[in-house]
A protein has these predicted regions:
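Sec-dependent bacterial lipoprotein signal peptides
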Residues: 1-18
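N-terminal "domain-start" segment that seeds a small globular fold
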Residues: 20-47
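Short active-site neighborhood of thiol/selenol oxidoreductases, capturing the structured segment around
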Residues: 46-64
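Hydrophobic beta-strand anchors of alpha/beta hydrolase catalytic cores
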Residues: 55-56, 84, 133
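Active-site-proximal beta-strand/loop segments in catalytic clefts of secreted hydrolases
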Residues: 58-61, 87-90, 113-114, 148-149
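The canonical Cys-X-X-Cys-His
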Residues: 63-66, 133
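Structural microenvironment flanking redox-active thiols in thiol-disulfide oxidoreductases
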Residues: 67-104, 116-121
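Thiol/disulfide oxidoreductase modules built on the thioredoxin-like
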Residues: 106, 114-158
Length: 163
């Protein structure tokens, strides 16, 4: 019996490790999908198909400062200097979340599924207020966490420091 329990425990552990190796898929409110992969030993986050710095932008539907942050992030996304990914913390379903993204003027992918939000929140060590932006270098290492409203120049400065 002890041997059987050990085999079952080993099998469960192997499945957990195998699951950690794969890409996690997220559906964006604009209907596109993106995939990410987190390596806990290296503390790196990769976004499939992305080879440049990126920003995870955590926001909520009723946050005025979040809406004020969006134009600067839209400009960064349009410049091609960084990929911006929005994370809507209080999602209410794909249609409602797409409406929130439109209302805030968001022109970058934004995920809101509960599992995706929890996944990204856990990776960054928790979110204790919005807006929160976490800037990653092109290798997927978090380099700066900005809590609150910041000018575009703060993001540009961080991006320049990485080059």
């Amino acid at each position: 019996m002890k041997f059987l329990n050990l085999k079952v425990a080993a099998a469960v552990f192997a499945l957990l490790l195998a699951g950690c190796d794969g890409w996690k898929h997220h559906l964006s409110s604009d209907g596109t999908s993106l995939a990410s992969k987190f390596d806990p030993s290296e503390r790196t986050l990769k976004i499939e198909g992305n080879d440049k710095p990126f920003v995870l932008f955590f926001y909520t539907s009723g946050c005025g400062a979040c809406k004020a942050q969006v134009p600067a992030l839209n400009e960064l996304q349009a410049s091609g200097d960084a990929l911006i990914i929005g994370i809507l913390g209080d999602g209410k379903g794909l249609e409602a979340d797409a409406a929130v993204a439109r209302e805030k003027g968001i022109k970058f992918p934004s995920v809101s599924g509960a599992n995706s939000v929890k996944y990204f929140e856990t990776i960054v060590g928790g979110i204790f207020g919005t807006p929160t932006s976490v800037i990653y270098d092109k290798n997927g290492k978090a380099v700066k966490k900005l809590i609150g409203l910041y000018p575009k120049s703060a993001f540009e400065t961080q991006l320049k420091l990485m080059n």
